[in-house]
Amino acid sequence: VIPMPFYINEKMYLEGVTLTQEEFYEKLKKDEPISTSQPSPADLCDLWDKLLRDYEEIVHIPMSSGLSASCSTAMGLAIDYNGRVQVVDNQRISVTQRQSVMDAKMLAEAGKSAAEIKKILTDQKLDSSIYITLDTLKYLKKGGRITPAAAAIGTVLNLKPVLQIQGEKLDAYAKVRGKKQAKRAMLKAMKNDWETRFKEYASDGEMCLQAAYTGNLEEAEEFKKEIQEVFPGMEIHMDPLSLS
C-alpha cells in the first residue's frame, strides 16, 4: 500500500504514516487549510522496483480515474515496465477498492496472471455501489461541489445529502431531512440494488456488504445493526473511513 499525501498549512503528511486519522479529523474540525495530492512518480516507481526484485508481476489498483489523477499517472509510468505492472482502472474507491484488492489476491492465489486479473476486475467495474451521507455540508461547499447559498439553505433546513458512486464519479442520489432519513435512504437504495442490479449475485450468495465511517465508531456500529436488520445473516465488514 502506498500512502496518499496531503497538505495541512502547506506541510506534507502521509495518510496513516505521519498523521493518524484522529489527528487529521481534529485539524479538519479546526478549519485548518487542507489540500490533497497524489503519490509522486518517484515514490511509485521505487515501490514497484522494490517489489519486482521478488515478484514477476504487479497488479496496481489505484483510486478511480474519475476521482483522482493518481490512476492516469500510474498508467503512464507502467508503460516503461513492459507489461510487468498492470494498472487497473475499475472505478473503485473506499470499501469497494479494498474489495478489489482482496479479489485480486484471491485470483493471484488461483494462478491468474496480472493481465488476467486486470481484465477480470475491469469487466466487473460496475458490479458495486457506494452510498454516502455527510454530517455537514461545509466541506462540499469548500470543495466547490455546492454553492454557499445551497449550503446555507441545507444547513437551516437540516438537509443531509445522500451521494452515490456507481462508476467513476461521485453523484447526488437524494436530499433528505436529518441523518435518520439519510440512513433510511441508503438502506432503501441498497435493498433496491440487491433486488435488481445484483439479483443474480445475491441469489448465488456472492454479495458483500461493507460499512465505513470517520471518527464515529459508536454511530457506525448502530448503522451496522440497521443494515443487518435489512439483510439478516449477512456479515458486515467495518472500515474507518466515513459513515457510508
Map each language-model feature to its residues.
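N-terminal glycine-rich anion-binding loop in soluble enzyme alpha/beta folds
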Residues: 1-39, 43
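Mixed-charge interfacial surface used for oligomerization/domain docking
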Residues: 1-7, 11, 57, 66-86, ...
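A short glycine/small-residue-enriched secondary-structure motif
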Residues: 20-25, 48, 53, 75-80
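Generic surface-pattern signal
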Residues: 29-33, 53, 126, 195
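Short catalytic-loop micro-motif centered on adjacent basic/acidic residues
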Residues: 35, 60, 87
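N-terminal glycine-rich phosphate/adenylate-binding segment common to multiple enzyme folds
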Residues: 43-71
